[in-house]
UniProtKB/Swiss-Prot annotation:
One of its GO terms (cellular component) is endoplasmic reticulum membrane. Component of the endoplasmic reticulum-associated protein degradation (ERAD) pathway. Recruits the soluble ubiquitin-conjugating enzyme UBC7 to the cytoplasmic face of the endoplasmic reticulum membrane where it functions in degradation of misfolded or regulated proteins localized in the endoplasmic reticulum (ER) lumen or membrane via the ubiquitin-proteasome system. It is found in: Endoplasmic reticulum membrane. It comes from Candida albicans (strain SC5314 / ATCC MYA-2876) (Yeast). It is a single-pass membrane protein. This is Coupling of ubiquitin conjugation to ER degradation protein 1. The chain crosses the membrane at residues 6-26. Residues 27-189 are cytoplasmic.
Amino acid sequence: MDSSTVLFIGAVAVAFIFLKWMVSPIPPQNEFTIDHLSQDQSTGSTTSSNAHQNRDTHSISTQSHRNSRRAVSESMIEVVQSIAPMLTVEQIRYDLETTGNVEATVNRFMELGDLPFPPGYVRPQQPPTPSEEPKKQEVIGKRSVNLLEKYNIDAKNPKSDHNSLLHQRRQEMILGARKRLAAQLSNEL
């Protein structure tokens, strides 16, 4: 074999190995999963033969886990908060401590639309905004502005003598828009 052929085959082999390494899947990091929760749930709920005893054991182990406060990282909270920004940090932390991973918390939020508050947590009361009613009235008032009154246009006499050409064009434009709207509304009825 020629030396260039050997060099070509070697380069192809190195390229193949390099591409194989680049395409191989990255092993998942368990950054968002709490391992000891899944171990406790698998041993706590399947070992008992009596269903009543099983529920008691599971609830006791769940309470002890809640009291011991599992480590929930800030990155876990940030991931959930980026998906559901209306949730409080306490709601997210409580649900992450309960479920053990971000995926279950996000799924629960998607199904329920909200997450439960921790026991004993008092929901912060948002102060009532007394300015909501005046704002609504302002919006309604702004919507019902009559352009004929605003620009002093006489609908009965559209060709009145005004000095400004701009004013006349504006008047014609507003009257034309009113006529088109009236025609459109009469066609719909």
